[in-house]
């Protein structure tokens, strides 16, 4: 009799799981049949007027080749091969959708300058549940512009000047606590900690370590779920992400309610951080943002500002380690700023604006390794472009990889040459350099990211005389959508042999 217990257990588990199994089977069938019908329909449609190219295999199109190119750092080759065969406008099929890729500045302009005219942002509903259906990413038209106006109350250059001291102190404390005193560190790990600390401090004024760590843990789970298979069942990444989003909402809701009380009682000011700015914002009609809009936008901002900034900052340090002459120019620029300060003087907006060469280094890093791969749009009408028709409902893709590494737009594009961005020289042609996107949906927080990278480099130079990579041959890889040094980029640190301050005057060394 005992020998049948395993069988009974298996049957019981099957009966218990049957609804879930049935759901998966039906979803699989639908996932096969519906794309097949769409694929056959697209094949039957007259090809006259459509851009040249190939849709690949049924169901998967060229998605696997595309993802392989992302993970193997061969995106440029993936695109170049198709441009060579079909030209600067070609069709393919990516992530289950017929897609037209537009290459070059003219194609970039068509997509980025025609939001809500010819194209609109398009994300899967499953992703929007995690990113926020009332976030700036999901909003369109007037709703998008209202949220953008709210964000500009914090992210505009004029507003950011108020937060330089707070950001600078957060960075200085982080370097003193987690970098200084260590002979060797992992740059990617510590930069990740730093970027999240800055966001937690300036977005919510959260200073407690355990609260920051809990937020970070939830955001990591959500980030994995955004592009996961959208199955809301135990054991699936998407299910875990939905649960994490619910917990994140509970934490943020508590912060919102407390801040409302603090604002009412005078314990908080209207501009002390992004949360206060959001809560006190009113549109042209005098309407405030709803709590749901604030929740959704904070979730999206925390995720969006983290990955891209960590990528950019880590790659800046990696490229400076490989180009000592450029690093020396950065050092001299930063020490020049310090030489004009007395001990205890804070960094000012004028100081940040004077970090011209350091900013050129960041720009050149983003040209070589853009933090965003590009983005998809959906055609909201038939689009006539370069003699072709892009049908309504098709996806369009723009990517900086069609201009950033090209000789026709940047001389010697394979070289790390920060001076190419010297604004006193030749200006970069429009729609060729797009590290922050463009048009209505350009990154609203790019000035914030610029400031935190420049201030981080400043405090690093102030603390360390130099650094050397443990593995100079380590590459920058795009294993995820954001490029990062492949093994965390461990470096040996060499602190300055004595303080930059002698008496009250900063000493240049």
Swiss-Prot record:
It holds the Pfam family p450. Pathway: Alkaloid biosynthesis; taxol biosynthesis. The keyword rRNA-binding does not apply. Catalyzes the conversion of 5-alpha-acetoxy-10beta-ol to 5-alpha-acetoxy-10beta,14beta-dihydroxy taxadiene. Also acts on taxa-4(20),11-dien-5-alpha-yl acetate. Heme binds at residue 443. It catalyses: 10beta-hydroxytaxa-4(20),11-dien-5alpha-yl acetate + NADPH + O2 + H(+) = 10beta,14beta-dihydroxytaxa-4(20),11-dien-5alpha-yl acetate + NADP(+) + H2O. It is a multi-pass membrane protein. The chain crosses the membrane at residues 20-40, 186-206, 218-238. The keyword Metal-binding applies. Belongs to the cytochrome P450 family. Its main location: membrane. It comes from Taxus cuspidata. It comes from the Eukaryota. GO terms for cellular component: endoplasmic reticulum; intracellular membrane-bounded organelle; membrane. One of its GO terms (biological process) is paclitaxel biosynthetic process. PANTHER family: CYTOCHROME P450 26, P450, PUTATIVE (EUROFUNG)-RELATED. InterPro entries: Cyt_P450 (IPR001128), Cyt_P450_CS (IPR017972), Cyt_P450_E_grp-I (IPR002401), Cyt_P450_sf (IPR036396). It is found in: Microsome membrane. Optimum pH is 7.5. This is Taxoid 14-beta-hydroxylase. Keywords: Endoplasmic reticulum, Heme, Iron, Membrane, Metal-binding, Microsome, Monooxygenase, NADP, Oxidoreductase, Taxol biosynthesis, Transmembrane, Transmembrane helix. One of its GO terms (molecular function) is heme binding. Its EC number is 1.14.13.146.
